[in-house]
Curated annotation (Swiss-Prot):
InterPro entries: Peptidase_S54_rhomboid_dom, Rhomboid-like_sf, Rhomboid_protease_S54, TPR-like_helical_dom_sf, TPR_rpt
SUPFAM superfamilies: Rhomboid-like (SSF144091), TPR-like (SSF48452)
Alphabetically ordered keywords of this record: Cell membrane, Hydrolase, Membrane, Protease, Repeat, Serine protease, TPR repeat, Transmembrane, Transmembrane helix
Protein name, as recorded: Rhomboid protease GluP
Catalytic reaction equation(s): Cleaves type-1 transmembrane domains using a catalytic dyad composed of serine and histidine that are contributed by different transmembrane domains
Membrane topology, record value: Multi-pass membrane protein
Temperature characteristics of this protein: Is more active at more active at 25 degrees Celsius than at 37 degrees Celsius.
Record-listed E.C. numbers: 3.4.21.105
Species this protein is from: Bacillus subtilis (strain 168)
């Protein structure tokens, strides 16, 4: 009797030492444990009870299946599997082997029964717990004192686990979300300032208040790498980012403390703006890069201490990252480069700062060096890359064109357009500016080069047709408009111009 009880507590302690988490363990003869990752079971139940008849096994298995189903539903898991181990002095008197060999299935829950019999102790232990040393359970341990000592050792392990969980829970008490709420208030305030000064969707207003604008950054307005994180384009953009910052920022600030959170948030905002500066020529604004930096900080915790992460936060944060990235790639006009840059910046900033009392100074220093090297390297590339310099020129020219400053556009782009590798976008904006000031021959030459680079650009063929018709080169005009109609047959203005050119040829 005492040997079986001794074995029961020894097995429980063995499982805890093997990474199992105690869910329930009191004065009763029942212990529930959560299995570590990559185990064949999700849960293990140790049940010390003398079985008389097989029907007791059947009834108990069905009851445990219902309990596991409730747990599965609460945790939102797709499936759960329980290893249900009976510790019984004797086996049931009737036919029980068939029950013990068959896994009980009920919907998305499965229960695998097993018996450890006092009369077949070593054989059963070897079958159910092959990693357990059966030599530790011999007749010399069959005493009340040894059983109590084994029980006390197990309970001490339970207390140790509880202390560890309290320590992990204390991670969320390192700071109050002061800066999170401050940034939320600041971005709401800035939104109203934008609205009363021209509108938050007005590009000129956004740029005036500090939006990321590549040409101005290249001219030395470095503060534009930081100021976009408090500006938002429209009420929907503000609402989405405010909700995201409230849900993610509060968790990060509680984990890392307010000081570390501030540095992570600002570093992520800057790296997000740098990535946008390098990969996107368009003006941009928003806290998305900094918010993705918060996700990066949580991702760092997930990778550096996976068990604590799963117990305190869970896998939902990974789902949030995937959903946000997927949403960004699926919807047009989303600055994904800024999102990814912020995610990377937040990750390395978190690794450099670490959680409070984290230690590991060497790794943190390396992370800080990597963060700075990445930021400086990409910024240097953005400032000196020919393609990026051209993108900045195109953006600047587009703004001048919208303001009606066509001659300034030609002055800005003529030198770049003379290069053989000038992009189609640059050639097209210079061409339409030349059209506005009457430089038709120059515009024709530019558009002819543009359609060679982008042969499916129907708008350029249409503009070419207009220019050829203006110069009375009707054969060329007809050929150009036919190509435009072929590329976009439903465009009515193309068809109208085609009819006009054909009529002029006939007359």
């Amino acid at each position: 009797m005492f040997l079986l009880e001794y074995t029961y507590w020894k097995i429980a302690a063995h499982l805890v030492n093997s990474g199992y988490g105690v869910i329930q363990a009191g004065e009763s003869d029942e212990i529930w444990l959560e299995a570590p990752d990559k185990s064949s079971h999700d849960l293990v139940r140790l049940y010390k009870h003398d079985l008389d008849f097989r029907q007791e096994m059947v009834r108990d298995i069905e009851e445990q299946a219902e309990r596991v189903e409730r747990v599965r539903h609460q945790l939102g898991r797709r499936r759960m599997k329980l290893l249900n181990v009976f510790f019984s002095t004797e086996a049931p008197v009737d036919d029980w082997e068939e029950i013990a060999k068959k896994t009980f299935e009920k919907g998305t829950v499965s229960v695998e029964p097993a018996i450890v019999r006092g009369t077949m102790l070593r054989d059963d232990l070897q079958a159910v717990f092959p990693s357990f040393r059966t030599e530790d359970c011999s007749e010399e341990h069959a005493s009340f004192e040894n059983a109590q000592m084994a029980r006390e050792r197990f309970l001490s392990l339970v207390l140790k686990q509880e202390e560890q969980r309290k320590t992990e829970a204390a991670v969320f008490q390192n700071g109050k979300p002061t800066f999170t709420y401050l940034f939320i208030a600041l971005q709401i305030l800035m939104f109203f300032l934008l609205e009363i000064n021209g509108g938050s969707t007005n590009t000129e207003t956004l740029v005036a208040f500090g939006a990321k604008e590549n040409s101005l950054i290249a001219q030395g307005e470095w503060w534009r790498l930081l100021t976009p994180i408090v500006l938002h384009i429209g009420i929907a953009h503000l609402a989405f980012n405010t909700l995201a910052l409230w849900s993610v920022g509060t968790a990060v600030e509680r984990m890392y403390g307010s000081g570390r959170f501030l540095l992570i948030y600002l570093a992520a905002g800057i790296t997000g703006s740098i990535a946008s500066f390098v990969f996107s020529p368009y003006p941009s604004a928003g806290a998305s890069g900094a918010i993705f930096g918060c996700l990066g900080a949580l991702l760092y915790v997930a990778l550096s201490n996976r068990k604590m992460f799963l117990r305190t936060i869970g896998t939902n944060i990974i789902v949030i990252i995937i959903i946000n990235l997927g949403f960004g790639f699926a919807v047009s006009n989303i600055d994904n480069s800024g999102h990814i840059g912020g995610l990377i910046g937040g990750f390395f900033a978190a690794a450099a700062l670490g959680l409070p009392k984290a230690g590991a100074f060497g790794k943190r220093l390396l992370s800080a060096v990597l963060l700075i090297a990445l930021a400086v390297g990409f910024l240097y590339y953005g400032l000196h890359s020919p393609s990026h310099q051209e993108s900045a020129l195109i953006q600047q020219a587009s703004e001048l064109y919208q303001e009606g400053k066509y001659e300034e556009v030609t002055e800005l782009l003529n030198g770049e357009a003379a290069q053989k590798d000038a992009s189609a976008d640059l050639l097209k904006i210079l061409a339409v500016s030349d059209i506005q000031i009457g430089e038709y021959d120059q515009a024709v030459s530019l558009l002819e080069r543009a359609v060679k680079k982008e042969p499916k650009d129907h708008a350029s063929y249409y503009n070419l047709a207009l220019l050829y018709a203006e110069k009375n080169e009707l054969a060329q005009a007809e050929k150009a408009i036919q190509t435009a109609v072929k590329l976009k047959p439903k465009e009515q203005r193309y068809k109208e111009l085609q009819r006009q050119i054909e009529n002029n040829k006939e007359s």
